[in-house]
Amino acid sequence: MLETLNAIDSFVWGPPLLVLLVGTGIMLTIRLGLLQVLKLPQALKLIFCAKNDGHGDVNSFKALCTALTATVGTGNIVGVATAIKAGGPGALFWMWLAAFFGMATKYAECLLAVKYRTVDANGNISGGPMYYIQNGLGKQYKPLATMFCVFGIMCAYFGVGTFAQVNSIVEITKISAGIPVLYTGIALTILVAAVTIGGLKSIATVSSKVVPGMAVIYFLTTLGILIAFADQVPAAVALVIESAFTTTAAQGGFLGATVMLAMRSGVARGVFSNESGLGSAPIVAAAAKTNWPAEQGLVSMTGTFIDTIIICTMTGLSLIVTGVWNGELNGAAMTNSAFTSAFPAFGSWLLLVGLVLFAFTTILGWNYYGERCVEYLMGVKAILPYRIGFIILVACGPFLKLEEIWVMSDIVNGLMALPNLIALVALSGVVVAETKAYQQHLKEEAELVPVKLAEETNH
């Protein structure tokens, strides 16, 4: 089974998809004039200072936090560990590169989500790649939108949304606290059911309260590890850069890695972590209260910066400076070893709290993403059956194998990204035009011109 999945994964994440994924980010970076660098201060300011007086269901901050619930998850802890285990320290460099260009991609997809959003039968905002494919490219491209939704549901049901998160939670609770898998699975299922029944506003409320605090705590913990091993940090950074362009030899429990494997592992896990180009973040960005698509694009862009450039970097360097990356461990167990190396008395508990909160909120965010995909395909009546199915799969997650889960997640992530990337390339001219209009508005301090919501789409 694992060999078959690995073969499919190698095909899906082969050179064509890597070129399309990174190439789309490079193209958007050029067309937008290095926006992710020049406008980053403005974007960070907007997180807390956006006016939030336009159409939408939640404010920009809550929309960002909900997106971060799905991105800041096990990919930042377990995903980085598995990437380095498979591709060596050089995988971290390729995560950085993918994230840098991915910021432009995230900006573009979230801008388009607001521009082409619509209203569903319940009066709620609906948006995302399926809507900017259909309403931006034309209804003749609806099969592409359908393809995105099918793979989006697969991601939510069988990949990053449930199995990968649940499995990581039960693994770390068993390692750190000795709690049986069954008990953790039952408790997690009950908690997920309690929050998801409340829909987006319930998820957004939980996210806005949990995400900022947990991100700061995790950052400070990993910073403590780097301070404890400060003499190893320069060598670790040098190893990351060197390993990105040269084959890493086998050593200890590390089997060795080629440059291509480092690149594939880094980019694939980077997408798993920050979701730039995947098309998931635009689904919740569409619900933000804003009159300017570019404004929410800037806010959403910071998610990739926070997720990968900051959090994944701290995790990756912690694994390298402590020397656990080339040992026998993998996944959460590897990260746990790094934490206990620096903090023997309480390292496991710090990781336990961080990973459980990260993974739990990721489950909530992906429940919403899958819900919107189901609604697009089958209407609002299908939402409740979808939620029930999601909760059942959360209950099944603890009993699956870690290696198979991560490979399966990579596969469906790649398939989900494909239709979205095609749409981003085709609609890049719209992104540039909207960006220029917004920046000109800021210069002239003109009156806001609200974005008109499209009429409810009949599917």
Feature annotation, model-predicted:
Residues 1-74, 84-91, 102, 395, ...:
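N-terminal alpha-helical transmembrane segments of multi-pass membrane transport
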Residues 9-42, 85-123, 144, 307-314, ...:
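Extracellular loop-to-transmembrane helix junctions
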Residues 17, 32-36, 75-80, 156-170, ...:
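Transmembrane helix-loop junctions in multi-pass membrane proteins
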Residues 20-27, 31-44, 166-173, 180-241, ...:
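Membrane-interface loop-to-helix entry segments
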Residues 24, 28-29, 101-123, 130, ...:
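Helix-loop-helix module between adjacent transmembrane segments
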Residues 29, 107-121, 223-239, 247, ...:
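Extracellular/periplasmic helix-exit of transmembrane alpha-helices
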Residues 34-60, 82-84, 88-92, 104-140, ...:
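Flexible loop linkers connecting adjacent transmembrane helices
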Residues 54-86, 112-130, 134-136, 147-150, ...:
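Alpha-helical membrane segments and immediately flanking helix-loop junctions
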